[in-house]
Structures are given as structure tokens and as C-alpha cells.
């Protein structure tokens, strides 16, 4: 394994069955940034008991775009759970956006929510409260400890499948069924 495992930006992390942290059990995490300082991602398969309509009302942003009111808000991770993050396609230009690549961005500024509420743009969004973060070397160590599987991200899984199907779909990209994974793992 290389010093940085390879850059995992725009990859999925699939929690292994031995994951001890309850925040990540059976989670699928999209990595928006990974570099020598650490990593930042959002869990994309954990809807919480809140809809976009409720969130928009809570932050006093009108939600006029059709079809969005009933969409769930997600638990994005255990860091800054009082703050919203929007994974969206296309990346666009917003006040506070981490541009992952030409196709996708992660934004934490209010202007994107105002645009979503008024026009439904950008057309593909996943809104979370909180994010997942790792310090320098932490994610690499967790991967070495067999806490995670990694696979290049497929945004069709995030934006095109119901949350309960996303983990299995990501695992199918690796040719693996979650039920066949062991809770103990080793290195050959």
C-alpha cells in the first residue's frame, strides 16, 4: 500500500461488517476530498427523519420547486451535524463549494438551497446534516485495518437509487455480497 493508499477523491467507502463506530455501520460514504491533510466525505445511505420541506421551513428558505418536498435529508456523518451539506450534480458555482470534479460538487452555503428551493437547480442533490472527516493518515490506517472497502464512485448509485439499495449496488461493483463478508479479516 502506498503512503496515501492512492487518492480516494470521488470514491465510495463501504463499511466492513467489523466496523466498530456506530456512525458508520453498514454505511456507504462518498469521498469528496482526499489528500495528505486528510479526507472529507458524506454518508449517502442514511436518511434521517426529516424531509427537505421540514429543513427548508426550519431555515426559512421557500421550497417552491416541484417534487422535492418529500425527499429525505441524510445523516452525512458525525462532524458538524448542525450544518447542512449538499452533494450535487452538476458542480456549478456557489459561495462555498468543494468542486470534486467537473461533474459533482459539495456545497455548504445557503445560496444552493435557495436555488434548489426556487428553481429545483441543480437537478440532482443529496442534502445532509453533518459530514465524515479523517485527519492525515487516519483513513489510510482504517483501510489498512480492514474497516473499509473502496471503489470508484458511480453517481448513478447516489442520485438514481433509493438509499436502501445504494450499499448493495456499490458492493456489486466489486462483485461482493455484503452477506458473504466476514467480520474478521487479515492480510495474505
Swiss-Prot record:
Signal peptide segment: none
Under SUPFAM superfamilies, the record lists:
VC0467-like (SSF143456)
Q: Which Pfam families match?
A: DUF179
GO CC annotations?
Answer: cytosol
List the residue ranges forming a coiled coil, or say none: none
What is stated as this protein's family in its record? Belongs to the UPF0301 (AlgH) family.
| Name the record gives this protein | UPF0301 protein AZOSEA09490
Species assigned in the record: Aromatoleum aromaticum (strain DSM 19018 / LMG 30748 / EbN1) (Azoarcus sp. (strain EbN1))
Q: What is the lineage of its organism?
A: Bacteria, Pseudomonadati, Pseudomonadota, Betaproteobacteria, Rhodocyclales
Amino acid at each position: 500500500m502506498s503512503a496515501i493508499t492512492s487518492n480516494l477523491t470521488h470514491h465510495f467507502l463501504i463499511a466492513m461488517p467489523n466496523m466498530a463506530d456506530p456512525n458508520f455501520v453498514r454505511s456507504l460514504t462518498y469521498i469528496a476530498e482526499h489528500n495528505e491533510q486528510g479526507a472529507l466525505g458524506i454518508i449517502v445511505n442514511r436518511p434521517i427523519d426529516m424531509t427537505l420541506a421540514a429543513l427548508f421551513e426550519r431555515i426559512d428558505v421557500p421550497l417552491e420547486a416541484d417534487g422535492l418536498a418529500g425527499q429525505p435529508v441524510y445523516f452525512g456523518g458525525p462532524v458538524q451535524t448542525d450544518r447542512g451539506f449538499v452533494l450535487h450534480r452538476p458542480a456549478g458555482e456557489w459561495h462555498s463549494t468543494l468542486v470534486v470534479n467537473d461533474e459533482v460538487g459539495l456545497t455548504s452555503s445557503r445560496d444552493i438551497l435557495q436555488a434548489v428551493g426556487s428553481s429545483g437547480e441543480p437537478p440532482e442533490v443529496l442534502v445532509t446534516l453533518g459530514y465524515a472527516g479523517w485527519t492525515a493518515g487516519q483513513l489510510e490506517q482504517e483501510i489498512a485495518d480492514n474497516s473499509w472497502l473502496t471503489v470508484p464512485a458511480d453517481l448513478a448509485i447516489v442520485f438514481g437509487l433509493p438509499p436502501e439499495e445504494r450499499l448493495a449496488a456499490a458492493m456489486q461493483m466489486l462483485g461482493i455480497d455484503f452477506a458473504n463478508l466476514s467480520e474478521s479479516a487479515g492480510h495474505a
